[in-house]
Amino acid sequence: MWNHKDSYRVRNGIVSASTIEHPSLGLVFFPAFDWKISATHPERQERLLYTRDQIVEEGLLDVPNIREYNPIVADWDVIERVHVGAPDLASWVTDAHRVSVGGAIAAADAVLRGEVDRAFALVRPPGHHAMAMVHGIRGFCTINIEAVMIQHIRQTYGVKRVAIVDTDVHHGDGSQDVFYHDPDTLYISFHQDGRTLYPGTGFMDEFGGPQAIGANIDIPLPPGTGDEGLLKVMRELVLPILHEFKPDIVINSAGQDNHFSDPLANMNVTAKGYAELVDLLQADIAVLEGGYSVQEALPYVNTGIILSMAGLDYSCVIEPNYVEQHQSADVTRYIDDLILKWKDQWARREEIARDELIGHKNRWVRDYSVYYDESGVQEERRETVRLYPDKIGWHSIESYGNYGPYAKQSVYAMFIPWQADDATREEAFTEARRMKEQGGLNRYVVVDPMGQGQVEI
């Protein structure tokens, strides 16, 4: 388990990771050879084929401190403690999604049971664009793998403070959505600037909900960022924030599409750069997310990550098409300035939290839209957060989906926080029943993650 006191030391205000010599590593593979969005889609069957071949060819499964685990099929119950579907989850979730989630759960179990020090789930389909409400597929994602895994970890092992560090090139707007109102889950994403790449989100003002200011850290990086920039952000910004947050466990959403050869982005990171990034982070669990340079990047990036997590030498991991490139001076200056702005905002988080509540009594409301690019669904939402002076309140979503294969769908979903006491839980159910009496939506659902699970009202 991640320990900020033992794993990190502070020098001149910068936190650097110390290494555990040859930690044991669990690997879980689920390449989902029977699932694809389409035959030519980037998220297709052979995405992990070359990675598996590379790992076998390098003999990594024969290394004494590396152990392979089989995925499981995740139960519907644990998925429904995170997600609400329209018209229902079964309309969108396949067996492949349940096994992908189950692969992450198997990795977590191996670590939390003390069988290995760390684990890496190389699974697909990916999940970090999947939000709590599911009207279809967006950003290749339907179920949020890490979110369901975290629910399992909390429910089974009693872990409280969790940090997610998302190293995918795309902002993980789904993970942000699930945990935006949870002050005990720190979500950090550094990604290509949303003004230049899908999903167009992930900016500094997305700092967490009104009762969780500072629990959401979005670091939008300029196109052309290379190893130098990513490692600087990790050392000077991400690690110090983790040190202050003091998580019980750290999870890496290990997207690999920052690689210089990835066809869907414009970054300049190498396999060795990824390995060093992972070495600095010292995550307990890594879960594969994006990465679509199937032959030129994924086999080498994954090999580097495995070697790094197992405490082995990764200095010889070099892609066949590698050409040394240097990050431009303009990109470096931009990143330096961004780090300074973030340090200032992080230091002012309590002041920002107070300002956020000005004008709100016991409720905070926002309206926004979500587009499901793979399913053609346009969703309109009204989100309401119940504010208490001394505890975490529930939040609800009135969700209206239009177009797509199921035409018009509407759901009222009440989300009870996992930290809820009996009084909060009772009030949430009362509010959901009141909303149903008013009518107007197809379904009324309460999600009680540490209690009854998902309940139809």
Language-model segment annotations:
Residues 2-165, 170-457:
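HDAC/HDAC-like amidohydrolase catalytic core signature
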